[in-house]
């Protein structure tokens, strides 16, 4: 009995110490974030110098992630065409090359993290800023919290009200936009070695509930022995499928992967960054979507058209039966 009590006390003490250490670590990270201030001030000066030559400036702030950023491309088009704005887009440096594909963005300003923009915002009060982040966006690196006066949507409810673009545009103080995004890719063929018709397949997701097991995916592909698939993503899941080429996984830049999607005849994948790329490139697509949190009929994509076919389930994607996916894919491949 004493041993059980001792273990219980030890366990509680361990949790208490861990929480204290976590609290201290969080506070220290916020203190250390001050090291970003010189860089932030330098970038504020860049913006102010830029304003001297371009008076009618609007700053769009959306630092991450790929799918969110691509979905919000129409924000820049709206500001440019409606108000003739010179558009500056502040984004995480990892995604700078994505914004460079937005036709109506005049200047891309990369930051290392959300906290760097937090410090920049202290000196940008006189600028027109459209912060597309939901209120209380927390920096993953330093923990600083970005505030937004538009509090209608938040991480817990935004999928209930519309597409990413619809909720993000309102969050940024704009009308509710619902246009299709566009990526400005040229006609260059970056994959001349692929000289046959193929489908791009992307099975990775940030959340395990949004994708299926490797075994299920391989079984789906086994129903199409005469079709060629090329997998994109950071990691290969389908290298055991005889009709799937996975050599590009983890080896392409973001923009190279966009060109691969552009070249394919069909995109197949889950609700993920590459699905938003396919939407922006107006590719024929089969997108597999299931229940997400408490919602089983959400629509993250804007400008929806006949090129995109969505297979839905009231279950999470990981629990879906493959039959409905195989049937839809067969129907699409007939045309």
Pin down the residues of each PLM region.
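Catalytic machinery of carbohydrate-active enzymes
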Residues: 1-335
């Amino acid at each position: 009995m004493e041993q059980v009590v001792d273990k219980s006390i030890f366990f509680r003490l361990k949790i208490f110490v861990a929480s204290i250490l976590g609290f201290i670590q969080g506070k220290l990270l916020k203190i250390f974030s001050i090291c970003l201030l010189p860089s932030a001030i330098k970038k504020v000066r860049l913006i102010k110098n830029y304003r001297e030559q371009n008076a009618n400036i609007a700053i769009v702030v959306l630092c991450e992630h790929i799918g969110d950023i691509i979905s919000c491309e129409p924000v820049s088009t709206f500001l440019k065409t409606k108000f003739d704005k010179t558009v500056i887009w502040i984004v995480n440096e990892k995604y700078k090359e994505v914004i460079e594909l937005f036709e109506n963005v005049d200047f891309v300003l990369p930051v290392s993290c959300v906290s760097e923009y937090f410090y920049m915002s202290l000196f940008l009060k006189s600028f027109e800023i459209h912060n597309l982040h939901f209120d209380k966006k927390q920096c993953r690196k330093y923990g600083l919290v970005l505030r937004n006066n538009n509090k209608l949507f938040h991480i817990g409810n935004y999928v209930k009200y519309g597409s990413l673009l619809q909720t993000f545009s309102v969050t940024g103080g704009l009308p509710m936009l619902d246009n299709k995004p566009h990526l400005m890719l040229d006609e260059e063929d970056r994959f001349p070695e692929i000289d046959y018709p193929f489908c791009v397949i992307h099975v990775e997701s940030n959340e395990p509930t949004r994708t299926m097991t490797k075994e299920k995916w391989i079984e789906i592909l086994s129903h199409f022995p005469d079709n060629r698939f090329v997998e994109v993503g950071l990691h290969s899941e389908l290298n055991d499928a005889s009709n799937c080429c996975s050599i590009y996984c983890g080896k392409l830049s973001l923009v190279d992967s966009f060109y691969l999607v552009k070249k394919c005849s069909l995109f197949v994948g889950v609700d993920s960054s590459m699905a938003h790329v396919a939407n922006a490139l107006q590719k024929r697509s089969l997108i597999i979507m299931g229940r997400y949190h408490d919602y089983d009929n959400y629509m993250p994509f804007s400008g929806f058209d006949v090129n995109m076919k969505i297979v839905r389930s009231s279950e999470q994607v990981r629990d879906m039966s493959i039959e409905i996916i195989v049937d839809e894919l067969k129907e699409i491949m007939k045309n």
